[in-house]
A protein has these predicted regions:
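Extracytoplasmic thiol/disulfide redox context detector
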Residues: 11-90, 94, 149, 153-171
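Hydrophobic packing within well-folded, soluble alpha/beta domains
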Residues: 58-61, 101, 144, 175
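C-terminal cap of thioredoxin/glutaredoxin-like
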Residues: 53, 69-70, 131-192
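Structural microenvironment flanking redox-active thiols in thiol-disulfide oxidoreductases
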Residues: 74-134
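Solvent-exposed, acidic/flexible segments
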Residues: 57-61, 91-98, 107-111, 123, ...
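C-terminal structured "cap/appendage" subdomains that terminate the fold
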Residues: 1-3, 22-23
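Divalent metal-coordination and catalytic microenvironments
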Residues: 5, 50, 114, 144
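Transmembrane alpha-helical segments of multi-pass membrane transport proteins and ion-pumping complexes
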Residues: 2-14
Length: 192
C-alpha cells in the first residue's frame, strides 16, 4: 500500500511539474538570501522579503530610498529588505567604485551608514569624496583602504552583478518581492 501511495504521489508531482509553465528568466531571484553575505535590514524570519538590485550612482535608486523607507515603516518587522549591487558602468562610471566602497564599509558593519551618504552625494563619488564618506560613516580609514583593494570586496560586487546579468536585468532599481520580480512602479504605493 505504501509503495502504491508513493508511486501515485511521484506520478502526480511529475505530471504537475510538466504542466506548470517554467518561470521566465529574470522573473525569479536566482540567489537565495544569505544572511552572512547579504546586506539586510529587518528580521531574518520576516514573512516578506524585498530585494533591491541597485547602483549608487543611479538617480532612480537614490529616489527609491525614500520609497524603501516608507515600505519598511509600513510593514515594520514583517519585512526584510536586502540590497544587492548592480553597477551600470556604461552610464555610471563611478558605480563600481562606490559599490566596492560600500563593501569595504560593510566589513566594518557600516554598510547602512555608508550607503545613504553615497546616495545623498551621488554626483560626488571621486575617491577623495568616498574616503570622506567612509570617515563620516565611522569607518577605520586604514582598514577601509586595505579592504577596498581586497579581492574579497571586488568579488562580492562582481558576484551580485553577475547574478543580475544571469537574470537578464537591465535597469536599476530592480526589485524582487518574496523571490519574484516586481513589475510596475517602485514608489511606496507600488511596492506596498
Amino acid at each position: 500500500a505504501s509503495v502504491i501511495a508513493f508511486a501515485l504521489g511521484w506520478a502526480f508531482f511529475r505530471i504537475t511539474d510538466r504542466l506548470s509553465p517554467p518561470v521566465a528568466v529574470g522573473l525569479k531571484l536566482i540567489r537565495p538570501i544569505e544572511p552572512e553575505r547579504d546586506h539586510i535590514r529587518g528580521p531574518a524570519d520576516a514573512p516578506l522579503t524585498l530585494v533591491e538590485y541597485g547602483d549608487f550612482e543611479c538617480p532612480f535608486c537614490s529616489r527609491a530610498t525614500g520609497s524603501i523607507d516608507e515600505v519598511r515603516a509600513h510593514f515594520g518587522d514583517e519585512l526584510r529588505y536586502v540590497w544587492r549591487h548592480f553597477p551600470l558602468e556604461r552610464v555610471h562610471p563611478r558605480a563600481t567604485d562606490a559599490a566596492r566602497a560600500s563593501e569595504a564599509a560593510a566589513l566594518q558593519g557600516k554598510f547602512f551608514d555608508m550607503a545613504p551618504l553615497m546616495f545623498r552625494f551621488q554626483d560626488h563619488l571621486e575617491w577623495q569624496d568616498i574616503y570622506r564618506y567612509a570617515d563620516q560613516a565611522g569607518c577605520d580609514i586604514a582598514r577601509f583602504d586595505e579592504d577596498l583593494h581586497s579581492p574579497r570586496v571586488l568579488h562580492r560586487v562582481e558576484d551580485d552583478a553577475q547574478d543580475a546579468e544571469v537574470m537578464d536585468l537591465n535597469a536599476t532599481p530592480t526589485f524582487f518581492v518574496n523571490g519574484l520580480r516586481h513589475k510596475g512602479p517602485w514608489d511606496s504605493a507600488g511596492l506596498i
